[in-house]
Design a protein with these regions (language model features):
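Generic structural motif
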Residues: 14, 28-30, 99-101, 112-114, ...
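Pre-Walker A-like glycine/lysine-rich segment at the N-terminus of P-loop NTPase domains
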Residues: 1-56
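Conserved P-loop NTP-binding catalytic core
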Residues: 37, 48-116, 138-156
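Intrinsic disorder/low-complexity detector
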Residues: 36, 42, 48, 120-124, ...
Length: 161
């Protein structure tokens, strides 16, 4: 499949993105590129992290050092986590809509972050899910990782990360 484009990314309680945030990335014949700009800490790198987490269950652009860098933060939005009690959790998801001329696939990866202590969290990332458009209907697809490799070969992932 050639000319796959991401139409939309929906982030729900993912890192800096509190609540549901939709990022439209549709192109048109006269608009072939999207530019994402913003101040440091506004979430630009985490948009790329969200894509790789959704597709490949990896966040290669996270700083894994122990100096409270991004890698030290929970997957779920920190403001949402601060508002809950120990033992409760915040749920979220990353949803990516892509296709050729129109949306054909919706990949979703859900997560849950539990508040273990006031400054300690535990995140669980669920398996990848896929809905594919057949005619006018959207249907769940078994083995979404296999379909993902057909749409976006592994070499594409390694080029990005």
């Amino acid at each position: 499949m050639n000319n796959i484009q991401i139409f939309k990314i929906e982030l729900n309680n993912y890192r800096q993105f509190q609540g549901v945030e939709e990022i439209s990335l549709e192109t048109s014949p006269d608009k072939h590129i999207n530019v994402i700009e913003g101040q440091n800490g506004s979430g630009k790198s985490n948009i790329l992290n969200a894509i790789t987490l959704c597709f490949y269950n990896e966040e290669p652009h996270i700083d894994d050092s122990n100096d409270r860098g991004l890698g030290a933060d929970p997957v779920a939005n920190l403001k949402e986590l601060e508002a809950i009690d120990v033992g409760e959790s915040v749920r979220g998801h990353i949803e990516i809509t892509l296709g050729k001329d129109e949306p054909q696939y919706i990949f979703t990866r859900k997560f849950r972050t539990a508040k273990v202590d006031d400054d300690e969290y535990n995140s669980v990332i669920e398996d990848l899910q896929l809905r594919q458009k057949f005619g006018a209907d959207w249907q769940n697809v078994e083995n979404p990782n296999t379909r993902l490799r057909e749409i976006l070969p592994t070499r594409v992932h390694h080029t990005v990360s």
